[in-house]
Design a protein with these regions (language model features):
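C-terminal segment of classical bacterial N-terminal signal peptides
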Residues: 20-29
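Extracytoplasmic/secreted envelope proteins and their assembly/folding machinery
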Residues: 53, 79, 83, 94-97, ...
Length: 335
């Protein structure tokens, strides 16, 4: 049997095939992911409450989306998980996210989970170290790629020193604190709640503080995930907002989650949350662009970012406020 294909038949068939391809493609783009991965971290207290409450699972259960929680011990680990795709949402410091973005990490900063003073330079109670200048030739515990690391580099720069003038000892944050109090290092670029713990329990001294050098706590999302699933991103941020507002209304309960998760005493959690954590403004925007541009300019000057880095363009590429802005508009319309 011979099948005759006319030009008209061919055209109609091509149109039908194209329409089918568009339909299949659209369906694939709209299909919900099977799983969402996000982190929790002791430096992001709201994430601890959110994980324990089960509100993310509650939000996505009706879609059949599984939720996987991963512990980030520092911004470096969160960025590693984001880059590898094991999580889609990760908590970092703003400065760490900026450096990660410059190094090719495919992320967008979409939300402010806190405005902290979570890092300082710390030494032992009986140490002779009084200023940053005294760190020359000393062993300093630090976690590379985190806000404490960037804080240390900027503090050294202000004192006319570089990282080459000290002896960095590379440890994760909890191990750095333990190394300090055991005398294995002379100083530590600290991070709460570990910093507050050693300050209260062993008399560790915060010998150099500068709140302006602490960059904001930002929630990041993988770019590809956000592009494919903007509604999921907005729903996740809406749940984060529920947890943030609940935390502000129930500070004692939030403190309890930090005590439980980080296994610290109540007085330690009280110092971190009561004195050094601000949850008031979750909307990432111009304030944060200015702060990260200033920090990025310094990081470029001291060699953390490449000399030819266009810092304003890098910051603009990192920060994406469209999701939280839409969430705010939706919530305002519901009031």
């Amino acid at each position: 049997m011979t099948i005759k294909i006319t030009r008209r038949t061919f055209k109609l068939g091509s149109i039908a095939a194209a329409a089918l391809a568009l339909t299949v493609g659209a369906g694939a783009a709209q299909a919900a992911p099977e799983r969402i991965g996000l982190d929790y971290a002791y430096y992001n207290p709201v994430s601890l409450l959110l994980k324990d409450k089960g509100w993310v699972e509650e939000e996505f259960k009706k879609d059949g989306i599984d939720v996987r929680w991963v512990l980030s011990l520092g911004s470096n680990k969160a960025l590693e998980f984001l880059n590898g795709g094991s999580i889609q949402f990760g908590s970092t410091a703003g400065g760490a996210a900026l450096v990660g973005k410059a190094n090719g990490n495919p992320i967008k900063a979409i939300y402010i989970y806190s405005r902290p003073e979570w890092t300082a330079l710390v030494t032992g109670k009986d140490s002779g170290i009084k200023s940053v200048a005294d760190l020359k030739g000393k062993r300093v515990a630090v976690t590379r790629g985190t806000d404490p690391h960037l804080f240390l580099l900027q503090a050294l720069n202000q004192a006319g020193l570089t990282e080459k003038d000290i002896k960095p000892v590379l440890l994760q944050h909890p191990d750095g604190g333990r190394a300090l109090v055991s005398g294995q290092v002379d100083a530590w670029a600290g991070l709460d709640p570990h910093m507050a713990k050693h300050e209260l329990q062993e008399g560790a001294r915060l010998f150099h503080r500068d709140p302006a050098l602490n960059t904001y706590g930002v929630l990041n999302v993988r770019e590809d995930f956000a592009t494919e699933n903007p509604e999921i991103v907005e729903r996740l941020l809406a749940v984060y907002e529920r947890a943030r507002k609940y935390s502000l209304e129930n500070p004692d309960e939030l403190r309890g989650y930090l005590v439980k998760a980080a296994k610290v005493e109540d007085e330690i959690a009280k110092k971190q949350l009561g004195e050094r954590t601000d949850l008031a403004n979750p909307v990432i925007g111009e304030e944060h662009r200015k702060a990260l541009t200033a920090a990025g300019t310094v990081l470029r000057e001291i060699g953390v970012l490449k000399a030819d880095t266009d810092v304003p363009a890098l910051v603009a590429d990192l920060i994406d406020d469209q999701y939280i802005q839409r969430v705010n508009r939706q919530q305002a319309a519901q009031r």
